[in-house]
A protein has these predicted regions:
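Active-site-adjacent beta->alpha loops and helix N-cap segments on the catalytic face
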Residues: 21-33
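Loop/turn elements at helix/coil->beta-strand transitions in domains of secreted/extracellular proteins
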Residues: 10-14, 37-42, 61, 189-192
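Conserved beta-strand positions
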Residues: 12-20, 45, 66, 196
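Catalytic cores of secreted or luminal carbohydrate-active enzymes
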Residues: 125-176
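Short, acidic/polar
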Residues: 1-9
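Carbohydrate-binding surface patches
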Residues: 124, 130-133, 138-140, 176-215
């Protein structure tokens, strides 16, 4: 309580409760301490919040890490990003899954940063998938060294709009065809954001129907 009181005096508005104080008892203590003050504070849990307590994280936290730390490799990003569908029932406005930060641009620890090892196509997948998951888009790179490509990824208005849709639904897997996986996220205006991703290492073709997406009639595809 003394810590929270000090943070409130400092004007803090985001708390990342880091390194496994992620049992329900301790998270409840911090939740109650934060809510005892008349200040909006984003309460983020890190990391690897236990799946068995998902309903509690939805009740107690604004976002919770569902994974360990991400690395700027296809293996790491795809393994974390493509395994979030089970959390969808617990996601909604004010309560989000966090599969970790975005690893685009200049990343790393300390003074020796390096450009992300994700290819441009893999970076498109990374940003698009996190947007469909309604996950926090936490920038994990050095903002002082943004190149034009990374800046374009992080400032794509249409992608951000999908991520920030007021309905707050998490996109889920609706179809899998070999290495092709299709995600769909309902939007507040009645439309649907759809993502087709190739998880393989070679070119592949994927198809979908209006029915598989859950829509019918004439549609405008953007």
């Amino acid at each position: 309580k003394n810590d929270v009181r000090q943070w409130m005096e400092w004007g803090m508005d985001y708390l990342k409760y880091d390194w496994n104080p992620n049992d329900v008892y301790h998270v409840t203590e911090m939740h109650d301490a934060l809510r005892s003050h008349n200040r909006d504070v984003v309460f983020s849990l890190s990391n690897s919040a236990p799946w068995g307590d998902a309903i509690q994280w939805e009740r107690l936290a604004n976002c919770w890490r569902t994974t360990g730390d991400i690395k700027d490799t296809w293996e790491s990003m795809s393994r974390l990003g493509f395994n979030q569908t089970k959390w969808a029932p617990f996601v909604g406005p004010g309560h989000w899954i966090d599969p970790d930060m975005l690893v685009v641009g200049m990343v790393g620890w300390g003074p020796k940063l390096h450009y992300t090892r994700l290819t441009p196509d893999e970076q498109y997948t990374h940003i698009s998938l996190w947007a469909l998951l309604s996950s926090p888009l936490l920038i994990g790179c050095d903002m002082a060294q943004l190149d034009d490509f990374t800046l374009s990824l992080l400032t794509n208005d249409e992608v951000i709009e999908v991520n920030q849709d007021p309905m707050g639904k998490q996109g889920i897997v609706i179809a899998e065809q070999g290495n092709i996986v299709t995600y769909a996220k309902p939007l507040e205006d009645g439309s649907m954001a759809v993502g087709l991703f190739n998880r393989g290492n070679t070119m592949a073709k994927g198809t979908l129907t209006w029915k598989s997406v859950g829509i019918r009639g004439e549609q405008t595809v953007r």
